[in-house]
């Protein structure tokens, strides 16, 4: 698996995206599984939850860049149907305070293009981190 190989490497930083169904224990377990792969290497994790309205997500679903880079989105009608079905079936936005992990940012990006959203993430990443309680026992800091 790519995560295991990357964890062992000397490479700096990995970004991956994941549509997290917060009402599915299997998704919480998957996140813990990924953390378990990297934990022996002392990896620092940063979590960014991007939130956009359904209308905007449907618009973004058909952009040239997305269609070029994501084969699964090229059948726009099918992709839009999946988006609507997933929205009806899963809770895809966390509740405030629900994410107990260190270095977490919840970013509403309905009105942000990718560049300003990335700038906000970089800005949050660069802030001094202030500890807060973490029920998992790990060091916890908000972004």
Language model regions located:
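Glycine-rich loops and low-complexity Gly/Arg-rich segments
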Residues: 1, 38-43, 71-75, 130-134
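Glycine-rich phosphate-binding loop used to anchor ATP phosphates in small-molecule kinases
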Residues: 1-49, 54
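Short, amphipathic alpha-helical "lid/cap" segments that border enzyme active or binding sites
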Residues: 3, 114-122
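Residues that form generic nucleotide/phosphate-binding pockets
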Residues: 5, 60, 124
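Short, glycine/charged-enriched secondary-structure capping and boundary segments
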Residues: 29-32, 61-65, 120-122
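Switch/connector loops and helix/strand junctions flanking conserved nucleotide-binding motifs
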Residues: 54-61
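Small-molecule kinase domains that catalyze NTP-dependent phosphoryl transfer to phosphate-bearing small molecules
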Residues: 63-117, 132, 137-143
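C-terminal alpha-helix
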Residues: 120-131
């Amino acid at each position: 698996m790519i995560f295991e190989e990357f964890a062992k490497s000397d490479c700096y930083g990995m970004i991956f995206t994941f549509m997290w169904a917060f009402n599915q224990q299997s998704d919480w377990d998957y996140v813990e599984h990924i953390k378990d792969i990297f934990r022996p290497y002392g990896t620092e994790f940063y979590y960014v939850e991007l939130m956009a309205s359904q209308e905007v997500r449907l618009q973004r679903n058909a952009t040239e860049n997305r269609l070029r880079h994501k084969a699964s989105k090229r059948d726009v009608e099918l992709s839009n149907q999946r988006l609507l079905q997933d929205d009806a079936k899963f809770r895809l936005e966390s509740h405030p305070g629900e994410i107990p992990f260190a270095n977490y940012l919840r970013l509403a990006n309905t009105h942000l293009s990718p560049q300003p959203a990335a700038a906000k993430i970089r800005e949050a990443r660069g802030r001094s981190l202030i500890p807060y309680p973490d029920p998992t026992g790990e060091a916890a800091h908000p972004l």
